[in-house]
Amino acid sequence: MKYDKNQIFVMKAAPNNWVDYADELRNSMEYLWERESWGVKIEYDKIDGYNEKSLISRTWLLLAGFAIENLIKGLIIAQYPSYISNGKLSRELRTHKILNLAMSIEGISLSSEEQNLLKIFEKCIPSWGRYPIPIDIEEISAEVNATTKIKVTFETLFDKFNIQIEEILKQGWKGPHGCTLVSDLKSGLDTQVLNEIIKHKTSRKPD
């Protein structure tokens, strides 16, 4: 069976694929965290003076931010399928302002610690997490070091968004252009239906 471009886009942008990417990022984060003891580096500049930095902190936080961003956008798409219609991602999702995105999600409440972490990710993703500077002087912010407390908050937040997506998929997700998605969490299989059934395995492990 042939699918048009809009249908292909929906299948690739369906909520389960955002979850898969988030899982991959989380796995990479765990790999890094296990090597957290590899050491620190001491930096000095005339602005900030001496700073002690973990060798994995910036990268770990960047991956954490991307993982949460994928889950947030996947959950929003699960709630608002029209955001991936007509072969385009909605302008509402073309942003790294993930706190605002998270606060727009139906049925989600965030603790102050979780909101603060999302604020950190908003600074990390476009700036010090991957570049030495942001695109505008007004966006410069102090770098944050990854800590065990941040890791615990991340894991709680990750699971919170993930559970919400799974609850929607268990009921069956109806996307645009005739695409639907049903998740069989026990078997670890996702089934995409478009006039016929297409089965594929995901990276999620069976319970």
Regions picked out by a protein language model, each given a short descriptive name:
Residues 1-20, 26, 30, 80-207:
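Long, charged low-complexity segments
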